[in-house]
């Protein structure tokens, strides 16, 4: 079902008055969640955030009833089609989403297979066919593979009819057995290259070229030095033309995390790595038969924020391919810490030429007596160099294919697949490090700005279903926007780009996001401050638009966002001045909520006021007679400043503080006297009732001859005196006092809820969020 939500209309603003009478002796504590107002926030913090209520108008959703796990996405630009692999189903949707009914293939698991799956100890929800691979074979057919209730199957689909999966065959070694197993696959030259596990238990990892019969595949050796409990992330192909080497071979790169065999501590250390094989590899004639002779791997280093320590888990890797002739691709990876409780995400960029340089460097040899790796000396490396693709220079040496390589070369590469040096990120450090967001997926594309300069824009999917849009400026990523994607938090499982649209797959749906939605930026300053390479302010249209390379009458500033020099001075919007009545000495927090987390804010207050404490949520003021007056929060970004919030601090009912204090004291004395009088009358009535009951008992004793002067045996005497008040009751004279069925003197409509602690009174119906009586 396709659905497009309408843009929500803003409701009426609340009146700028307090809808309740000022309290007599309560401290008014203002507290809201807002952007920081003191200090400079890092660019890893999103500049703006759109909750689901605002973001929903920019999203288009697709979901089929009773269908889940929309995790496999494939975009076919030629046919403008998005293929979606879900649980037991495959869909074909026209791009961009337009409401057209999608085509669907149901690829169900027979009940006999499901019974066998359950007999193997698997849960009912696991015994389905989770689609894991979708790949374009040619213009007429797709290849697809699914888990098929822990018995992987593969088949082809005729895209013109799109009715069923045909020519089924075993998918073992191509597709994982369950969706929780990380895998990767890529099609190169009509051939499928995969990285997955080969057995039911998931203990035999394999990187293979799946052509023909399984026994004829070229695959990795079953040695822990080759692959040691890997979690595969991505697979990518680079052609020789992208290297500028027309005589070379296609190279397939696999990105994964595996357990290190080098024991630097008592814990199992996870290491992110990249491996490479050559498309023309035929294996060895005797040694490494049906095995890769070009398999090399190296560490990927993405230093963490603490002591330069590398992040140990690779979560995702995206490839950004420039236009033909505009340079080599670049890889963007998301890294996280392997240690529980360390919520660290880092984004690093890697250049293919840096990876190739490491693969051409020294090998590492693992010394079994010390469990540490040492570099192999150059004079110990045989010739021709092990692990190289067969190129023209090797053919000149009579090595026409890998089948003609000598055994000493094959033996060396079998025993030394790991390189000694790591691959460092471009610029030597991460582009982005955050300690409060868990990134799971990434895609990237290159956008040309109004000036003609190109910028890389990254889309980062989070663990709780948010989308962060970031632009790379120099050696830093600046997170421009946080977009909530789903009504309920859920991980982002897959992402694909199609022109100006981003397709996001999750457990419950596929979401289409417009990546060039400039129209929501309503003013010149908002358009410039957004720093979006796609958007520019048009003076002719008086709107923020996607510039599409047009320069006339448009302005944009990606790196400086200098509003003051590009935009005309906009009429200032003065916020409503909220009057804040206070009645006793205490602390008041005045909120300041700028629209941008990157804005720097200052407070203007009455002269002579010094008892002020800037906070992340506003300004804390110590209430004194000298603190009364006007307060304003002014925020600046891009050279433009405006007042965000304004307050007037006054004594409760516009009377002087001394008269107010006298009134409070007088009211307190009157209340105390009335309380004493009421207590005396109550005790008198209780005494009279007890006396009358005693007289009736004495008369009854005279009649039956019983002595009620002492308690009967087996009972305990007790006193009828009222219990003394508890210390908690004595702390809360205001909370216990009621007037007009209200609480603490406030009428019932402004009571929010019962307080978890009787020392806190919560109010509603006004910008005063919290009253804390314990601060009085």
Curated annotation (Swiss-Prot):
In the UniProt record, the signal sequence range is 1-39
What are the glycosylated positions?
A: 69, 138, 514
The reply to whether Cell membrane figures as a keyword in the UniProt entry is yes
Q: Which residues lie on this side of the membrane: Cytoplasmic?
A: 687-776
| GO molecular function annotation | chemorepellent activity; neuropilin binding; semaphorin receptor binding
Instruction: Write the record's keywords in alphabetical order, separated by commas.
Output: Cell membrane, Cell projection, Developmental protein, Differentiation, Disulfide bond, Glycoprotein, Immunoglobulin domain, Membrane, Neurogenesis, Phosphoprotein, Signal, Synapse, Transmembrane, Transmembrane helix
Source organism superkingdom:
Eukaryota
Give the location in the cell.
Cell membrane; Postsynaptic density; Perikaryon; Cell projection, Dendrite
For the region Disordered, give the residue spans.
702-741
- Which intervals of this chain are the motif PDZ-binding? 774-776
State the InterPro entries in the record.
Plexin_repeat, PSI, Sem4F_Sema_dom, Sema4F_C, Semap_dom, Semap_dom_sf, Semaphorin, WD40/YVTN_repeat-like_dom_sf
**Tissue-wise, where is it found?**
Expressed at low levels in the developing embryo. Expressed at high levels in the lung and adult central nervous system, including the dorsal root ganglia.
The protein's topology relative to the membrane is: Single-pass type I membrane protein
* Residues recorded as bearing Phosphoserine in the entry: 724, 726
One GO biological process this protein is involved in is: axon guidance
User: Which family, according to the similarity comment?
Assistant: Belongs to the semaphorin family.
| Self-association state and partner proteins as the record states | Interacts (via PDZ-binding motif) with DLG4/SAP90 (via PDZ domain 2); this interaction may promote translocation of DLG4/SAP90 to the membrane.
Supply the name of the protein.
Semaphorin-4F
Biological source species: Rattus norvegicus
């Amino acid at each position: 079902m396709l659905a497009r939500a309408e843009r929500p209309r803003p409701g009426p603003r609340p009146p700028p008055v307090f809808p309740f009478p000022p309290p007599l002796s309560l401290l008014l504590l203002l507290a809201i969640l807002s952007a920081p107002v003191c200090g400079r926030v890092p660019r890893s913090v999103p500049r703006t955030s759109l909750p689901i209520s605002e973001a929903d108008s920019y999203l288009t959703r697709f979901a089929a009833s009773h269908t889940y796990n929309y995790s496999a996405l494939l975009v076919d630009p030629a046919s403008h089609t998005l293929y979606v692999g879900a649980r037991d189903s495959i869909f074909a949707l026209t791009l961009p989403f337009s409401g057209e009914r999608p085509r669907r293939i149901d690829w169900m698991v027979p009940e006999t297979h499901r019974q066998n799956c359950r007999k193997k100890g698997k849960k009912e929800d696991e015994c389905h066919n989770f689609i894991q691979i979708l790949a374009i074979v040619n213009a007429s057919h797709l290849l697809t593979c699914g888990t098929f209730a822990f018995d992987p199957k593969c088949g082809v689909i005729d895209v013109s009819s799109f009715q069923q999966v045909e020519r089924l065959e075993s998918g073992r070694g191509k597709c994982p057995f369950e969706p929780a197993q990380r895998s990767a696959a890529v099609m190169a030259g009509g051939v499928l290259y995969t990285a997955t596990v080969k057995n039911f238990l998931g203990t035999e990892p394999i990187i293979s070229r799946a052509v023909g019969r399984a026994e004829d595949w070229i695959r990795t050796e079953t040695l822990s030095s080759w692959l040691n409990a890997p979690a595969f992330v991505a697979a990518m192909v680079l052609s020789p033309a992208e290297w500028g080497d027309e005589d070379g071979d296609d190279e397939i790169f696999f990105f994964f995390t595996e357990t290190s065999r080098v024991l630097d501590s008592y814990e199992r250390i996870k290491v992110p790595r990249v491996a490479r094989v050559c498309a023309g590899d035929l294996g060895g004639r005797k040694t490494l038969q049906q095995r890769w002779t070009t398999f090399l791997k190296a560490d990927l280093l993405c230093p963490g924020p603490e002591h330069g320590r590398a992040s140990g888990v690779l979560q995702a890797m995206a490839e950004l391919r420039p236009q033909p002739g505009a340079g080599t691709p670049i890889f963007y990876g998301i890294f996280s810490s392997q240690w529980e409780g360390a919520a660290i995400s880092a984004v690093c960029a890697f250049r293919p030429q840096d990876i190739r340089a490491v693969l051409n460097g020294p090998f590492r040899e693992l010394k079994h007596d010390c469990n540490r790796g040492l570099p192999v000396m150059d004079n110990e490396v045989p010739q021709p160099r092990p692990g190289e693709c067969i190129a023209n220079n090797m053919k000149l040496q009579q090595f026409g294919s890998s089948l003609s390589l000598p055994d000493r070369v094959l033996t060396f590469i079998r025993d030394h697949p790991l390189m000694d040096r790591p691959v460092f990120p471009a610029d030597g450090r991460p582009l982005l490090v955050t300690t409060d967001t868990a990134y799971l997926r990434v895609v990237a594309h290159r956008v040309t700005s109004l000036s003609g300069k190109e910028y890389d824009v990254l889309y980062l999917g989070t663990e709780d279903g948010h989308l962060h849009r970031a632009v790379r400026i120099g050696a830093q990523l600046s997170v421009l926007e946080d977009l909530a994607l789903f009504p309920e938090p859920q991980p982002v499982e897959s992402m694909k780009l199609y022109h100006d649209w981003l397709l996001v797959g999750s457990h419950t749906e596929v979401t289409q996001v417009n990546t060039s939605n400039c129209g929501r930026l309503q003013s010149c300053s908002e358009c410039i401050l957004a720093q979006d390479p796609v958007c520019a302010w048009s003076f002719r249209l008086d709107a923020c638009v996607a510039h599409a390379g047009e320069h006339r009458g448009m302005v944009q500033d990606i790196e400086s966002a200098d509003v003051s020099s590009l935009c005309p001075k906009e009429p200032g919007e003065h916020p409503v001045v909220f009057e804040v009545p206070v009645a006793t000495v205490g602390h008041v927090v005045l909120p300041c909520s700028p629209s941008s987390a990157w804005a720097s804010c200052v407070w203007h207050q009455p002269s002579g006021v010094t008892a002020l404490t800037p906070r992340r949520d506003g300004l804390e003021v110590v209430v004194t007679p000298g603190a009364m007056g006007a307060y304003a929060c002014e925020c600046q970004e891009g050279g433009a400043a405006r007042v965000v919030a304004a307050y007037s601090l006054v004594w409760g009912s516009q009377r002087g503080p001394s008269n107010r204090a006298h009134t409070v004291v007088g009211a307190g004395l009157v209340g105390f006297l009335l309380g004493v009088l009421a207590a005396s009358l109550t005790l008198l009535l209780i005494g009279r009732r007890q006396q009358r009951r005693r007289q009736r008992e004495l008369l009854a004793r005279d009649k039956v001859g019983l002595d009620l002067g002492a308690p009967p045996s087996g009972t305990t005497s007790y006193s009828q005196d009222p219990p003394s008040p508890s210390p908690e009751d004595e702390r809360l004279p205001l909370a216990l006092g009621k007037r007009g069925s209200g609480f603490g003197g406030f009428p019932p409509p402004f009571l929010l809820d019962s307080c978890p602690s009787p020392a806190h009174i919560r109010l509603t119906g006004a910008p005063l969020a919290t009253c804390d009586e314990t601060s009085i």
